[in-house]
């Protein structure tokens, strides 16, 4: 049975035709898989996996990987047993994942994990801003000849504001992933080993190379206590990946649904009294109000979590 048919039969995988493409299907794990922790060879692979009707992989994202402590496999004890040193540690940029791959006609796929979405426009926008025509030809040739997807983190604060502040649009190259069913990074994702010709695209900021358990513990502590970063992404010598998010980032993000519900009028402050973050939420609400911004992508007024993060960093 083809992988596409196996994905179609799996109740924990969504398979949807990609808008604007012929015979191309986006495979992603379902909300239930995420909610109940149903992780197996199909659900972990179905995270931005794009298959044609003949079972060819045309675009591919990362396999699902987890935060430290998110499950038994990523407890610190399990990680210490499993990893192979050295481990490369990169800054986890706070944007959204873009997947760029070569079409046969000299053009590109610009996909999010779901395929052609409204955010695909932003991927293409930032890509075109950061590259010249010669750069794009170099990138297309490399992706086509290597049969690879370039996974990127897209930063576009005017249209897609997150928690960590950025002053301008950026695009960080995270990895070159082989377009095949088995996950394989085909090039060093954190430094430019492919020569010049990538315009103003940046490679993900590799800030630590870790050689033993003691160093790993120290870097984890640095990441957890960071006041300015979302967190870190780790990749060991066998391409086993895991991540962490800073305590401040997690605290900020946890309040986002509540703040947006209060802004929309669906709920009141006191509706969140049973939440662990209520004391902080109440203090921000009574002292500063809920900061807002106009989301140019969704066309809605939303809680400005960058401002909330700044309040927490400096006042609470």
Could you tell me what each predicted segment is?
Residues 1-316:
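Core nucleotide-handling region used for phosphoryl-transfer chemistry
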């Amino acid at each position: 049975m083809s992988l596409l048919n196996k994905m179609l039969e799996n109740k924990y995988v969504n398979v949807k035709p990609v808008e604007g493409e012929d015979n191309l299907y986006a495979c992603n794990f379902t909300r239930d898989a995420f909610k109940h922790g149903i992780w197996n060879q199909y659900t972990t692979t179905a995270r931005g996996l794009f298959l044609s009707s003949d079972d060819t992989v045309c675009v591919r994202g990362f396999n699902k990987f987890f935060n430290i402590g998110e499950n038994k496999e990523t407890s610190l004890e399990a990680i210490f047993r499993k990893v192979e040193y050295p481990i490369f540690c990169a800054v986890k940029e706070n944007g959204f994942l873009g997947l760029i791959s070569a079409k046969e006609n000299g053009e590109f796929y610009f996909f999010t994990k779901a395929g052609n979405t409204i955010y695909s426009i932003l991927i293409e926008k930032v890509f075109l801003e950061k590259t010249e025509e010669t750069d794009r030809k170099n990138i297309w040739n490399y992706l086509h000849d290597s049969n690879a997807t370039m996974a990127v983190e897209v930063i576009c604060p005017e249209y897609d504001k997150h928690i960590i502040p950025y002053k301008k649009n950026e695009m960080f190259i995270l990895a070159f992933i082989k377009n095949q069913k088995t996950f394989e990074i085909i090039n060093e994702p954190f430094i430019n080993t492919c020569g010049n010709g990538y315009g103003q695209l940046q490679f993900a900021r590799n800030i630590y190379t870790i050689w033993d358990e003691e160093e790993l513990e120290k870097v984890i502590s640095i990441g957890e206590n960071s006041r300015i970063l979302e967190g870190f992404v780790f990749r060991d010598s066998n391409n086993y990946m895991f991540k962490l998010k800073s305590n401040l980032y997690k605290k900020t993000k946890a309040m986002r649904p509540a703040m947006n519900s209060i802004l929309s009028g669906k709920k009141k402050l006191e509706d969140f009294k049973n939440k662990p973050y209520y004391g902080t939420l109440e203090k921000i609400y009574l002292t500063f109000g809920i900061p807002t911004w106009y989301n140019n992508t969704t066309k809605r007024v939303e809680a400005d979590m960058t401002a909330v993060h700044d309040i927490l960093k400096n006042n609470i």
